[in-house]
């Protein structure tokens, strides 16, 4: 890679070091400064003329500073007559804001794509985009790599009874991700769904009205009850982030209805269904005193549950799901696995203290403080630098990268 160079932003120096070592090249000498007024200054101290430049900058806890720094580096390389500029973004910032979830929302991920293009980027390499459709936001080539081969290899090597495990999606939006991993490992999969706030008054009125309906309606309710009693469907209530005892037998559709769904007019009123972002937002935004429902579709009894999501950001949904899997569904243990470990605030501490979670597994796409790793004995970090380094090498040499979608590095 004589005509190539790699430049690292300030977001993830450890990953830069790992990738550079694998490629056998020394990172380009750059000066990253911040003025007293908060502005970012970038100085590239080596020539990049006619070079194939790869800029490594991931999302970080200072996401806006990291993004602005990346844009300035791209612009500086463009002004320095670089032959081609590739932004290597293991975790793409603002990827969760890739659609309008409410009226008058901004599609921020598309704006970030436009900013990168205007700055002068020629190519983007990223890993496990939150929504693969985001590739359509760009007018430049995008290579969306997968962490799945590395995660699958880790499972084979480190989970003793992985052949009997079940891959579980934390929400319906992650079904495609989970089924893909399940197919790779030849395992069964299961799905978890959480509904919105239940209204006891609404449910009681609904049940009272059921009693006055015709025999046909009563038959429908009975069938619903039988369906919910099947072994592969496990429903429970949770409150204050924990599963609660429910002595009341679920016998009516009101158990999975809510006043919110009945009265709220939203973006899904004309069809479609909420995504995993909406599920997460529902859990975090509802009143902490609101009783809610969680349902598992699948069988994890006596098995290891591999609870999968692309990002681990808020602990509440993982804790509730893990407690439900162990207490109500009979799972032997729960291993939480995600590509991007965005452990903000007390997230990692809360996951560590959860008795139902045995292990937390992430890749090093997102910078994690070394002290946090030392303090959390449940945390395992998979090195993903091999995938990124091989993608950089193949891109520079004009080779196909489809090989990376199936093989671990």
Curated annotation (Swiss-Prot):
Catalytic activity line of the entry: D-ribose 5-phosphate + ATP = 5-phospho-alpha-D-ribose 1-diphosphate + AMP + H(+)
Major subcellular location class: cytoplasm
Residues recorded as bearing Phosphoserine in the entry: 199
Keywords: ATP-binding, Cytoplasm, Kinase, Magnesium, Metal-binding, Nucleotide biosynthesis, Nucleotide-binding, Phosphoprotein, Transferase
GO MF term set: ATP binding; kinase activity; magnesium ion binding; ribose phosphate diphosphokinase activity
Enzyme Commission code(s) on record: 2.7.6.1
Subcellular location: Cytoplasm
GO cellular component, one term: nucleus
BP-aspect Gene Ontology terms: 5-phosphoribose 1-diphosphate biosynthetic process; purine nucleotide biosynthetic process; ribonucleoside monophosphate biosynthetic process
Source domain of life: Eukaryota
InterPro entries: PRib_PP_synth_CS (IPR000842), Pribosyltran_N (IPR029099), PRibTrfase_dom (IPR000836), PRTase-like (IPR029057), Rib-P_diPkinase (IPR005946)
Binding site for Mg(2+): 128, 130, 143
First-tier enzyme category under EC: transferase
CDD domains: PRTases_typeI
Pathway: Metabolic intermediate biosynthesis; 5-phospho-alpha-D-ribose 1-diphosphate biosynthesis; 5-phospho-alpha-D-ribose 1-diphosphate from D-ribose 5-phosphate (route I): step 1/1
Cross-referenced PROSITE patterns: PRPP_SYNTHASE
Family of the protein in this entry: Belongs to the ribose-phosphate pyrophosphokinase family.
Role, per record: 5-phosphoribose 1-diphosphate synthase involved in nucleotide, histidine, and tryptophan biosynthesis. Active in heteromultimeric complexes with other 5-phosphoribose 1-diphosphate synthases.
The name this protein goes by in its record: Ribose-phosphate pyrophosphokinase 1
Organism of derivation: Schizosaccharomyces pombe (strain 972 / ATCC 24843)
């Amino acid at each position: 890679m004589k005509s190539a160079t790699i430049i690292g932003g300030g977001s993830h120096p450890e990953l830069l070091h790992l990738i550079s070592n694998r490629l056998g090249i020394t990172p380009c000498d750059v000066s990253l400064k911040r003025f007293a007024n908060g502005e970012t200054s970038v100085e590239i101290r080596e020539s990049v003329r006619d070079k194939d430049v790869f800029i490594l900058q991931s999302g970080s806890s200072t996401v806006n500073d990291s993004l602005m720094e990346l844009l300035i580096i791209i612009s500086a390389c463009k002004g320095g007559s670089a032959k081609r500029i590739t932004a290597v973004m293991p975790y793409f910032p603002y990827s969760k804001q890739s659609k309008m979830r409410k009226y008058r929302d901004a599609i921020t991920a598309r704006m970030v794509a436009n900013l990168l293009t205007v700055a002068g980027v020629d190519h983007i390499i990223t890993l496990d985009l939150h929504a693969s459709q985001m590739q359509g936001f760009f007018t430049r080539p995008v290579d969306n790599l997968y962490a799945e081969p590395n995660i699958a290899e880790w499972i084979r090597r480190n989970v003793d009874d992985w052949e009997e495990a079940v891959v579980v999606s934390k929400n319906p939006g992650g079904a495609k991700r989970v089924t893909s991993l399940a197919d790779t490992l030849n395992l069964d999969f299961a799905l978890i769904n959480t509904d919105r706030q239940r209204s006891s008054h609404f449910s009681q009125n609904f049940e009272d009205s059921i009693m006055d309906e015709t025999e046909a309606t009563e038959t429908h309710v009975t069938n619903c009850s039988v369906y919910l009693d099947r072994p592969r469907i496990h429903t429970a209530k949770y409150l204050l982030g924990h599963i609660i005892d429910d002595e009341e037998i679920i016998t009516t559709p009101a158990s999975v209805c809510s006043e919110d769904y009945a009265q709220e007019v939203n973006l899904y009123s004309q069809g479609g269904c909420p995504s995993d972002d909406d599920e997460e937002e529902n859990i975090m935004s509802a009143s902490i005193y609101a009783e809610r429902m969680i349902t598992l579709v699948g069988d994890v009894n006596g098995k290891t549950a591999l609870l999968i999501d692309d990002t681990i950001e808020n602990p509440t949904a993982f804790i509730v799901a893990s407690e439900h899997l162990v207490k109500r569904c009979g799972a032997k243990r729960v291993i939480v696995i995600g590509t991007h470990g965005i452990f903000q605030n007390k997230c990692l501490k809360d996951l560590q203290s959860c008795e139902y979670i045995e292990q937390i597994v992430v890749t090093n796409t997102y910078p994690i403080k070394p002290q946090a790793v030392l303090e959390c004995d449940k945390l395992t970090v998979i090195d993903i630098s091999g995938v990124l380094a091989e993608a950089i090498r193949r891109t520079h040499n004009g080779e196909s990268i489809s090989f990376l979608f199936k093989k671990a590095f």
